[in-house]
C-alpha cells in the first residue's frame, strides 16, 4: 500500500510538472523537460535491447521507466537529471569486456541510429562512455521483449509488452511509456526506418507534447495514430481507429482522376439507388469540402504512399461515422445535388474485401477469345491443379488480377511446376538480429525462373492498383519472373514483408512490417510499390459506363501478343 501511495504522488508531481507550462497539444514542452524526457526514453529503450540483465527480464522494465519519469520531470536543472540517468546505469550489473564481439559476415542493409545517446547535450561524457562500452561489449542472445524465429525465415515477434487494458485513458507516465515503447521498437526493429519521410530520431521530440497534453482517451488514441502514421507503412494500423465509425453509407467510393467517385452499391437502400448514380462525384460531406477533409485526415492515415492514404480515407473514413444521417453534395453532368443519406451497420453491408473487383466470380475461368483469368481471392486448394491447367493450356495468355488480397491457397508453385520453371534467387529480404538491435542483414529467398529457353510460355499480364498489398505484392514479384510477363495498373500499397503485432498501454493494438523485401537489384518495394510496366488507371467515364478499363487493357495486350 505504501508503495502505491508513493507512486501515486510521483505520478501527480510528474503530471503537474510536465503540464504546468501549457494545456493544449500544440504547445511545446519547456526545453529542459523535452531534453530530459528524450534522454530518458532513448536510454530506457537502448538498455531494454542491449543490456543482458534487462533483456533477460531481470527487471520490470516498464516500472523502472515509470518510477523515473516524475524524477526527471521534477529535476531543477540539467545536471540533476543527467546525474540521475548516470546513476541508473551504475545500478545495473556490470557488462564484462568482450573483445571478440563482431558483426555477422552478412551484407548490412540498415544500420542503427542511436539518436541522442552519444550527444553531450543530453548525457555526461562519462555516461556516454558507459553507453558505448555496453554497445561494444554486451552480448544478448535472447531477449524477453523481442524474438526472431529463424524457423519462420526470420519472422520478428514483439513479446511481453503489457497493454494495461484497465487504463483506457492512461495517466501521463503510461502515455509516455506508450510513446517510448513504440519509438524504440521502430528505432531498433523496423526494416524501413530510413525510408520514413521524417527522420525517425526527430519524431520522439515532436510527439512528446501530443502525449503529454492528451486530455482524454480520444486525444491519446489520436496521438498514437499520428505516431503510427509517421512510419509511412501501409501495414501500420492502429486499433481502435476513431476515424472509422460504426456506421457507413450503402455504397463505396474511390479516388478517380483526383475526384471522389461512387463506384459500387453495397446495400439495398432504394432511396440511395434512386438518387445516387455510379460515377457520381462527391464534392462535400457534412458541409466540408473533400480537399479539406483529406488535408485534415492525412496525418492520421497510416500508409506507405499517397494513393494508399487516399484508399484508406475513401474506403473507411469519408462516409463512415456514428451518426445515422450524412449530408453529401454530388456533382453529375455539370449539375449539383444535395442528399441526406442514411448510414447502416457496416457489418450488414456487402463491402468488397481489399478491393476484390469481382467477389462473386470463380478463381479460374476462361474469358472471351480464349484468355485465361485468375482471381486469387477466389482460388481454392481443391481446384488449384485443374484451375492452373485450365488457364494455361492452349490459351492465348493468362490475366492474373491482383487488385485484391489472395486467399490462403498459394498458387505460385503450381504455376512454376506447370510451366517447368526452376528455383532461382529472386527476392531479397532484410532481417533483424536480436544480438545487434538496429541492424538489418540481407538474405536471399528462392523464387522461380525459366528452365528451358525453348519452352512456350503463354503471355502473362498482372493487374495491380493501390489494393495490391503485402502477400499480393509478393505474388506480383513472383509472377514478374515469368518471361514476357507484363504488369499494368497503378501504384501498389508498397508494404511487403511479414506483419508484426504488438500492444500499447490503454488496450491499443498496432502493427508494422517486420522484415524488408527487395527486388534482386536491391530496389525497394516498400513505399514505391511493385514495378509497373504500363500505367493504366480507371476513368470516371469508364466507371459510369460500367467498364473495367484495366481488364480491357490486359486483354488487348494478350491479343496483340498473338498477332
Question: Where do the PLM segments sit?
Answer:
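Bacterial Sec-dependent N-terminal signal peptides
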Residues: 1-25
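N-terminal mature-domain "stem" immediately C-terminal to a signal peptide or N-terminal signal-anchor/transmembrane
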Residues: 22-74
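Cleft-lining beta-strand/loop regions that shape enzyme active-site pockets
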Residues: 32-35, 48, 73, 186-196, ...
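PDZ/PDZ-like domain segments forming the peptide/carboxylate-binding groove
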Residues: 33, 38-41, 45, 115-150, ...
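Stable alpha-helical elements in mature extracytoplasmic
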Residues: 36-40, 64-68, 77-88, 175-179, ...
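Extended, small/polar residue-biased N-terminal targeting/export presequences
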Residues: 54-66, 70-160, 192-257, 322-327, ...
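Low-complexity, Gly/Ser/Thr/Pro-rich intrinsically disordered linker/tail segments
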Residues: 537-563
